Amino acid sequence: MFDKIKNFSEILSNMGSFREKMEEVKKRIASIRVVGDAGAGMVTVTASGEGQITNVFINKQLFDADDNKMLEDLVMAATNDALKKAKEATAYEFQSASGGLDFSEISKMFGGKFG
């Protein structure tokens, strides 16, 4: 019984440093910027580690094209590429901070945003 109390006490005493580490990870994630591209760079989309689109570039040659569907497909592909990279970068930050723990199960509890 006392061992369980001791273990619980150790967990509580480490919560402060864990909380600090998670705050540091949140700051690093907020500063992450990744670029997804499609059409050999004709469309690029920048996303933050938080999964927000921060920039979209479309080569002006695509505006002259008669095929809007192609442009739509390229924007969608570049966006999905950027969001995938952001998710991977975020998962890496969490795993690095946790000593390699897999956060995929914990992430599911938070809507799947972190790995």
Curated annotation (Swiss-Prot):
Family membership: Belongs to the YbaB/EbfC family.
Quaternary structure note: Homodimer.
Cited NCBIfam families: DNA_YbaB_EbfC (TIGR00103)
Xref: Gene3D superfamilies: Nucleoid-associated protein YbaB-like domain
Keyword line: Cytoplasm, DNA-binding
Organism whose genome encodes this protein: Leptospira interrogans serogroup Icterohaemorrhagiae serovar Lai (strain 56601)
HAMAP family xref list: DNA_YbaB_EbfC
Location, primary (coarse class): cytoplasm
Protein name: Nucleoid-associated protein LA_4332
Task of the protein: Binds to DNA and alters its conformation. May be involved in regulation of gene expression, nucleoid organization and DNA protection.
GO molecular function: DNA binding
Cell compartment(s), UniProt: Cytoplasm, Nucleoid
A cellular component term, taken from the record's GO annotations: cytosol
Pfam family, one: YbaB_DNA_bd
Residues of the signal peptide: none
Domain of life: Bacteria
